[in-house]
């Protein structure tokens, strides 16, 4: 089998008129901010997606029942016995905050040095347009699709898909019974293998707040008065061992352990190593788990307790000798199958009370269940075999990823085999500055999706 080099793929991309037409669409899409957390641009971008999919020949419904409009675009096969595949994507992005380093304007698609840069180019607007390009490339040489293709695009994925369950329930009759659902995105890993995964972790996020007094107090009382800062730090410390495991009674007993195939897939394919993580992030502290087998088990199959940020006391220039009266932290627990967000928060509340920290206030912010698959469904196995034709280094098949998304919500609603693969890379920098994809990977994804369509002929 002959595989194209990166240079050859870029040349093919540049000579492909359909791909070039849709790069103009991607450029316009990235220029339109759509940030759920700030309630910016959701209606405009959903409407723009409706317009481009109608122009591409799809039947489109724009459902505005909830905060972020839900876009459904259907390319219906004329074959009455045709199967259906669904692409799940989202059009919202995280902000491009001022503390992020961008070489160019994040909302202007930049093409340089074999890559494309811009907010959402990987997560997730680039995937929408690449997959739409694949449909159009097939229809350029065929009168009809051999399979019905449905795109579902939400606008709140970066905020725990707050209304997705309601949208799916509303449109269940249209979406139920599909042969396959292709998830929003994926990467080519550092070894050049396409990662094909079947799940993701869940999450529960919450704020922890402490108020120790009506006002800040002079620090001369530090020997006899407990400050909000110390109370919060001690409360947080009581919930985690030094090795990173969570100290909450009854939590691990609810975890569903992976089956033998899931364990075998991670052992065979997971390329993330302690050494790679240390190098990529320039770690200054020792890893909580450095032995590779346990390291991977932690990443894929165990929950984790994480502090996103802590706020308390004086942070200005110089010194202010006080005992802070208030302290707060933003906290998350990454979940695995068996753990339900609200139940986890209840266990944490109970543990804090038992540990003597009953003055801590917990405020739930969002939650999402986890989902995991052993990747044995026939339609998923077909994707794995098709992908091997396009990636010289082969594929990496994983039952889950360490990230979070609404896979559980979608599976519970639609009961369809789900698989994630995409056009990102190990350094795509999603949510960070200079978010990017490689042009060759972008075009290879287009070709693979087109080949998936061909496989239904």
Give names to the regions the model predicted.
Residues 80, 191, 247-326, 334-347, ...:
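An extended, acidic, His-containing surface patch that forms the Zn2+-binding/catalytic region
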Residues 124-199:
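Acidic/histidine-rich catalytic neighborhood of metal-dependent amide-processing enzymes
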Residues 166, 222-243:
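A short core secondary-structure module
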């Amino acid at each position: 089998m002959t595989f194209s080099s990166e240079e050859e793929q870029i040349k093919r991309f540049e000579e492909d008129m359909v791909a070039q037409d849709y790069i103009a669409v991607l450029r316009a899409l990235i220029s339109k901010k759509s940030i759920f957390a700030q309630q910016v641009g959701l209606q405009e971008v959903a409407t723009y997606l409706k317009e481009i999919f109608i122009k591409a020949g799809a039947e489109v419904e724009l459902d505005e029942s909830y905060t972020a409009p839900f876009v459904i675009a259907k390319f219906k096969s004329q074959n009455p016995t045709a199967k259906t595949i669904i692409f799940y994507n989202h059009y919202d992005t995280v902000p491009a905050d001022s503390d992020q380093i961008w070489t160019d304007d994040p909302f202007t698609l930049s093409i340089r040095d074999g890559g494309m840069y811009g907010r959402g180019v990987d997560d997730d607007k680039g995937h929408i347009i690449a997959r739409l390009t694949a449909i159009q490339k097939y229809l350029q040489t065929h009168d009809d699709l051999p399979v019905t293709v449905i795109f579902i695009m939400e606008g709140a994925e970066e905020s725990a898909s707050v209304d997705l369950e309601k949208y799916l329930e509303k449109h269940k009759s249209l979406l139920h019974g599909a042969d396959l659902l292709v998830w929003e995105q994926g990467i080519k890993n550092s070894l050049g293998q396409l990662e094909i995964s079947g799940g993701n972790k869940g999450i529960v996020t919450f704020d922890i707040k402490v108020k120790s007094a009506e006002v800040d107090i002079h620090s001369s009382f530090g020997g006899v008065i407990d400050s909000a800062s110390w109370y919060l730090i001690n409360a947080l410390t009581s919930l985690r061992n030094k090795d990173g495991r969570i100290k909450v009674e009854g939590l691990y007993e609810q975890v569903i352990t992976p089956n033998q195939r899931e364990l075998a897939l991670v052992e065979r394919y997971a390329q993330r190593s302690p050494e790679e993580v240390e190098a990529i992030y320039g770690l200054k502290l020792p890893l909580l788990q450095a032995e590779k087998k346990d390291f991977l088990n932690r990443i894929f199959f165990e929950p984790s307790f994480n502090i996103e940020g802590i706020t308390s006391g004086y942070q200005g220039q110089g010194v202010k000798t006080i005992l802070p009266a208030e302290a707060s932290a933003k906290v998350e627990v990454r979940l695995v199958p068996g753990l339900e967000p609200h139940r986890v928060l209840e266990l944490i509340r109970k543990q804090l009370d038992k540990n003597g920290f009953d003055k801590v206030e917990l405020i739930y912010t969002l939650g999402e269940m986890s989902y995991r698959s052993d990747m044995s469904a026939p339609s998923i196995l077909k994707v794995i075999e098709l992908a091997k034709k396009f990636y010289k280094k082969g594929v990496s098949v994983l039952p889950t990823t360490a990230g979070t998304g609404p896979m559980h919500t979608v599976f519970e609603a639609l009961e369809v085999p789900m698989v994630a693969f995409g056009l990102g890379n190990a350094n795509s920098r999603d949510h960070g500055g200079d978010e990017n994809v490689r042009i060759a990977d972008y075009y290879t994804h287009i070709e693979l999706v087109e080949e998936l369509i061909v496989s239904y002929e």
